[in-house]
């Protein structure tokens, strides 16, 4: 049944793409990316207006109506199928159906820390409530303000049936495949010798730029809800789609929803959307379709402005207006308000530092941290310490991308196309420097000191650009490998003579794509074991998560819908608590700690979210328990449990420190928990009383 629910979403997407292709002239290989982007844009606006559920129904009904319209109007037409099924669209629909069935059979689960703390949890909350996760009541003290693009994309594929982790991966992988289709969007059927190896290259991209060691654990590529890879793919896919649209003389507006989606994935990759918009706008504005710069300058200028308006509208509506409201609401509800410096002030003061101008206050204190971050990032780029891809450090990645651009320029059969590719390559290189500056500013003035010292998650942040940059370079190469027709006009008295020349790229450049595909597949085969990848993972990879979820389902069966759970997981580093928040929902798991704000400095201090609970004098000298030790007296813990409105304590893990510290708070001195008789204690006036339950099913 759940498989049919997802296939219904795929069928609705197909109907929408058919309308775009047969009625709106959008190429079949570009239509999936445009359709998915438009769906996310509609759902985002509807969710912000509080009408997500009816809007989703309306989208499905419109897709169905569009499919009926297309089927009725194209009955008996012999050209419809040929327009719908091109090399790019066949690649997309084949992979979409294959992965839908494959993931339904294999049932992968969310396991990574950030999936449980944000990405997968956001999707589950959106599905359960049929509303934005950012407005949901949670046990966490902070407002969830991450962009809703990906969770709402997953919501579209989760709409029918029950929530399931694997449906997230289906939705996100379908987005991946829509980008792949866009890259080969302009390749005709007779160019299969280009399309096939290009598809192999595209398959390798998510692996190639995110893995750099031999696998000894499961690599979650194609099985993750993180936003870093999608951000890079959509950034590059927008430019690749644009190149294919121009090559096919298709409607240019089809790229605008893609640019909007690029701005709706992650807040810190909004700059990638601006880069994509800039590359598209410059290509449109500088290179007129007929070669006459002055002709049609005003419409080209208007479209260039629209390219920037699409992502900036999303940024303003969500990141400025909506997030501003969420943060102020969280602060007024005794939660956490604004927790980082304003972006505009960060940019201004960072540039002042680079120009040698003095800065004051917070920025003067962080100047050394900013400069150190820049130095460390340079070290990661230039030296072998920076293992960021399957071919090593950043300089190697940039060299590979430069080679692809160079081959594309050489392969292009017309001077105009050579110039367009050269401009895109040069500008994307300049933007790469700007993106690195943005990362340095983030480490210097937004992230915490220890994060800057360790360049925490630097590889995830930088490979978003590398992936997008490589994808748009492949898009340039795909267009360059197509035949180019140049038209020359010569005056002959009162008449004009037009001469058209069809130029074919040399076979050697097509061979380059094959060599690139073989090289990337070979390198991937060296580092990624099939049994530790999406293509061959063992069911045992998710044994622990299945056990955790089974325990959560057992515990929830003994709870009331309005219960609020205090989490006790001794020795936890926070991951167990996030897992409980995810698995228990819609039953709320409390932050299980305190949130205090210094009235003088405004600094917020949060103690909770898992960790070791115990008396101050019992804190271990070292180890995980020392690092995540939350020291409370017995009276303080009792006040926290009751003050936070908790009705039940969930004893996930017990140890001697907790028993020695807080046994007197429990009516049975924790005897039932120690004997394995229960995992739950009800908060009563007399103390925390054990709840009878069958724990043998764990």
Where are these regions (language model features)?
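Membrane-embedded, hydrophobic transmembrane alpha-helices
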Residues: 1-84
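Perimembrane helix-loop-helix junctions
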Residues: 67, 71-83, 272-308, 590-594
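Membrane-interface alpha helices of multi-pass inner-membrane proteins
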Residues: 41-47, 252-267, 271-278
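Active-site lumenal/periplasmic loops and adjacent helix-entry segments of GT-C-fold
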Residues: 98-199, 220
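Membrane-lumen/periplasm interface segments of specific transmembrane helices
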Residues: 106-110, 153-156, 285-286, 297-408
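Membrane-embedded, lumen/periplasm-facing catalytic core of multi-pass transferases
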Residues: 511-577, 697-698
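Short periplasmic/luminal acceptor-recognition loop of GT-C membrane glycosyltransferases, typified by
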Residues: 526-527, 552-610, 651-654
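Hydrophobic/aromatic-rich transmembrane helices and adjacent perimembrane loops
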Residues: 124, 173, 225-235, 265, ...
């Amino acid at each position: 049944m759940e498989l049919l629910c997802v296939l219904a979403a795929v069928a609705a997407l197909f109907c929408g793409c058919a309308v775009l292709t047969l009625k709106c002239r959008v190429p079949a290989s570009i239509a999936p990316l445009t359709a998915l982007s438009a769906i996310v844009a509609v759902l985002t606006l509807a969710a912000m207006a509080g009408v997500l559920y009816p809007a989703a129904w309306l989208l499905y009904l419109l897709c169905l109506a569009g499919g009926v319209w297309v089927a009725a109007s194209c009955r008996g037409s012999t050209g419809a199928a040929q327009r719908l099924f091109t090399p790019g669209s066949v690649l997309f629909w084949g992979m979409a159906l294959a992965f839908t069935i494959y993931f339904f059979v294999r049932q992968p689960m969310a396991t990574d820390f950030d999936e449980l703390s944000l990405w997968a949890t956001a999707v589950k909350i959106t599905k359960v409530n049929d509303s934005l996760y950012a407005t949901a009541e949670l046990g966490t003290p902070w407002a969830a303000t991450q962009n809703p693009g990906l969770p709402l994309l997953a919501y579209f594929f989760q709409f029918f049936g029950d929530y399931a982790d694997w449906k997230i991966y289906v939705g996100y992988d379908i987005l991946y495949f829509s980008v792949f289709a866009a890259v080969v969007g302009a390749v005709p059927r007779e160019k299969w010798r280009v399309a096939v190896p290009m598809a192999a290259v595209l398959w390798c991209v998510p692996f190639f730029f995110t893995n750099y060691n031999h696998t000894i654990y499961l690599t979650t590529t194609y099985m993750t809800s993180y936003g870093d890879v999608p951000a890079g793919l959509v950034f590059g896919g927008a430019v690749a789609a644009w190149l294919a649209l121009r090559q096919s003389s298709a409607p240019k507006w089809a790229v605008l929803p893609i640019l909007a989606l690029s701005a709706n994935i992650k807040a810190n990759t909004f700059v990638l959307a601006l880069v994509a918009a800039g590359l598209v706008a410059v290509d449109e504005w500088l290179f007129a379709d007929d070669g006459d710069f002055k002709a049609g300058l005003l419409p080209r200028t208007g479209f260039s402005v629209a390219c920037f308006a699409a992502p900036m509208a999303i940024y303003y509506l969500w990141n400025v207006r909506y997030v501003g409201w969420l943060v102020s609401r969280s602060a007024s509800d005794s939660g956490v308000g604004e927790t980082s410096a304003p972006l505009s002030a960060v940019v201004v003061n960072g540039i002042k530092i680079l120009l040698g101008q003095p800065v004051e206050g917070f920025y003067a204190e962080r100047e050394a941290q900013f400069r150190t971050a820049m130095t460390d990032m340079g070290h990661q780029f230039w030296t072998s310490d920076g293992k960021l891809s399957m071919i090593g450090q950043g300089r190697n990645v940039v060299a590979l991308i430069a080679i692809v651009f160079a081959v594309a320029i050489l392969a292009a059969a017309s001077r105009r196309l050579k110039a367009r590719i050269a401009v895109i390559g040069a500008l994307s290189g300049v933007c790469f420097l700007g993106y690195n500056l943005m990362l340095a500013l983030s480490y210097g003035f937004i992230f915490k000191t220890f994060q800057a010292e360790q360049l925490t998650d630097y590889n995830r942040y930088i490979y978003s650009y590398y992936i997008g940059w490589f994808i748009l370079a492949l898009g340039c190469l795909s267009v360059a490998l197509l035949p180019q027709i140049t038209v020359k006009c010569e005056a002959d008295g009162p008449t004009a003579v037009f001469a058209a020349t069809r130029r074919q790229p040399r076979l050697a450049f097509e061979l380059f794509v094959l060599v690139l595909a073989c090289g990337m597949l070979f390198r991937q085969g060296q580092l990624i074991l099939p049994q530790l990848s999406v293509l061959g993972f063992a069911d045992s990879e998710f044994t622990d998560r299945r056990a955790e979820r089974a325990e959560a389902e057992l515990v929830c069966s003994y709870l009331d819908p309005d219960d609020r759970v205090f989490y006790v997981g001794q020795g936890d580093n926070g991951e167990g608590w996030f897992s409980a928040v995810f698995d228990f929902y819609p039953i709320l798991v409390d932050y299980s700690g305190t949130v205090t704000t210094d009235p003088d400095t405004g600094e917020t201090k949060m103690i909770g979210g898992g960790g070791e609970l115990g008396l101050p004098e019992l804190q271990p000298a070292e180890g995980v328990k020392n690092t995540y030790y939350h020291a409370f007296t017995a009276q303080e813990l009792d006040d926290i449990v009751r003050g936070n409105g908790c009705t039940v304590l969930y004893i996930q893990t017990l140890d001697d420190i907790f028993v020695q510290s807080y046994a007197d708070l429990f009516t049975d001195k924790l005897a039932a928990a120690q004997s394995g008789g229960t995992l739950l204690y009800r908060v009563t006036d007399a103390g925390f009383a054990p709840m009878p339950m069958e724990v043998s099913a764990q």
